[in-house]
Amino acid sequence: MSRMTLKSSMKKRVLSLLIAVVFLSLTGVFPSGLIETKVSAAKITENYQFDSRIRLNSIGFIPNHSKKATIAANCSTFYVVKEDGTIVYTGTATSMFDNDTKETVYIADFSSVNEEGTYYLAVPGVGKSVNFKIAMNVYEDAFKTAMLGMYLLRCGTSVSATYNGIHYSHGPCHTNDAYLDYINGQHTKKDSTKGWHDAGDYNKYVVNAGITVGSMFLAWEHFKDQLEPVALEIPEKNNSIPDFLDELKYEIDWILTMQYPDGSGRVAHKVSTRNFGGFIMPENEHDERFFVPWSSAATADFVAMTAMAARIFRPYDPQYAEKCINAAKVSYEFLKNNPANVFANQSGFSTGEYATVSDADDRLWAAAEMWETLGDEEYLRDFENRAAQFSKKIEADFDWDNVANLGMFTYLLSERPGKNPALVQSIKDSLLSTADSIVRTSQNHGYGRTLGTTYYWGCNGTVVRQTMILQVANKISPNNDYVNAALDAISHVFGRNYYNRSYVTGLGINPPMNPHDRRSGADGIWEPWPGYLVGGGWPGPKDWVDIQDSYQTNEIAINWNAALIYALAGFVNYNSAQNEVLYGDVNDDGKVNSTDLTLLKRYVLKAVSTLPSSKAEKNADVNRDGRVNSSDVTILSRYLIRVIEKLPI
């Protein structure tokens, strides 16, 4: 055989082999773990019909992060398909038994698909999923809708908004808030307008405002650069304060009215009617509303909220900031002189109690925020003494009745000097251990649920609130597993769940239509008011009921919505966030660990001539002196063994 004939024969054999590989991968003969095919020319030829057993995040996914679907049907091959029918990825689903829903499910992992666009999953023998997007800004609209939900909860004023072509509005409500009968025995009134209606009812509760405001203020402090430019459709949108903070200010304005008029610093527990009202519009509720006597938990939460408001509003409105911190000081002094846990006397009221077993967590949070705002030694010692009494520093499951995590986060992330190194290490260890546990729980759950098999009234709020733990852990010890678990929590409430339904009104696939919300039940409009996370299944994953009367599973609440807002805030304007320097991430994989130290040593010793990217070069300069050398190696090694608390130095 001639040399030319031999070359021609080899070309034909290689071409035949390539054709065979493509054919076999498209038909699912090769497992996706062995061959992951990105086929730009192949088109879907079968007419796939929507099947609700293919369950995924109907809002969409962010490039370069986890993307998973759960398929509750026997299957193997799946395709990721563009809107025009082009197959961009072929994979093999892996089976697992979900101990939560007690079913065998199949996990389709298509995390390597990162091109922005609109797609669906096609599963031979099953059907296709709802369309979803992959985009850096995929959560922008969801975030704005959740914030719209907060605006529409405003009390003491009229509200008006159009969403998806439907107009939602109500007239001025509860303008007589509130009477002092239960405070001083006189039927006189003290102004307590503004604030948000709490949940499905129209009352206002300080303790639940605590976790709500705390979560949203932390969202601002953790993601300020991402949130500051976000424009919201609110009446104050053209003033000099960022819109996100304008919405919070409306709540703080009400919070400031809750101090007793006698100047003692005590804070009323709630403003409420004696009994829950009917399903009528807020402007039609005319029952008298009263200040309910003080509690130590409400007073401590007041201190924390107003202290946070003082430092956050200081750059935008110094006079308002001064008003907030002065109020906080008065109530803090009262608490210092009155250490007993005092429950509110709520006799005569059948509305939400928000009675905490202990106020230790509330007082700890108050001390943390006072110290972070003012820097006084007194507040630091108060916090550290209280924190030492908590055997577990970070709890995986927390809400209005346990706000200690909020104080721990503030202390841990504070850049103020003087912190106790041993306490810092203890909190950090607890944080990372808890975050790692949440990651494992999500990875071992058939629907990526970060709360695992735990269910109770409002548990959906906790699912998204756990993103706070994951995001703070990621700030302390960068790890893409934390980010992906946070995204799993979001995915769960937007459709990757047993029902293949979004749990947020007005968003995603087949969202709730009948929430336990008086406005939605009374306004005569078919669609519910938008932007609200409902409570979710209880007592188990199959017990959610989308009916108005099911307050146990289908109510809305400001604390759950604030948790959703925090979760989404971490991924708003995410493109700009991704461009931030992650000091110590020398291999540019989104983590800082011993692998980075090894690469940095090799680079400094010239065993390798380049780092993976220009961003990696910036990440390697951990002392920010404009050079990458042995000093950076020393600093990074000290950081990894926790001699140095944070990077850069």
Swiss-Prot record:
Any matching Pfam family: Dockerin_1
Gene3D superfamilies: 1.50.10.10, Dockerin domain, Immunoglobulins
Reactions it catalyzes: Endohydrolysis of (1->4)-beta-D-glucosidic linkages in cellulose, lichenin and cereal beta-D-glucans
UniProt-annotated catalytic positions: 201, 516, 546, 555
Record's signal peptide: 1-41
Similarity comment: Belongs to the glycosyl hydrolase 9 (cellulase E) family.
CDD domains the record matches: Dockerin_I (cd14256), E_set_Cellulase_N (cd02850)
Record key words, sorted: Calcium, Carbohydrate metabolism, Cellulose degradation, Glycosidase, Hydrolase, Polysaccharide degradation, Signal
Name assigned to this protein: Endoglucanase D
EC numbers: 3.2.1.4
Function as written in the Swiss-Prot or TrEMBL entry: This enzyme catalyzes the endohydrolysis of 1,4-beta-glucosidic linkages in cellulose, lichenin and cereal beta-D-glucans.
Alphabetized InterPro entries for the sequence: 6-hairpin_glycosidase_sf, 6hp_glycosidase-like_sf, Cellulase_Ig-like, Dockerin_1_rpt, Dockerin_dom, Dockerin_dom_sf, EF_Hand_1_Ca_BS, Glyco_hydro_9
One record GO biological process: cellulose catabolic process
GO MF term (any one): cellulase activity
Essential cofactor(s): Ca(2+)
Domain Dockerin: 579-649
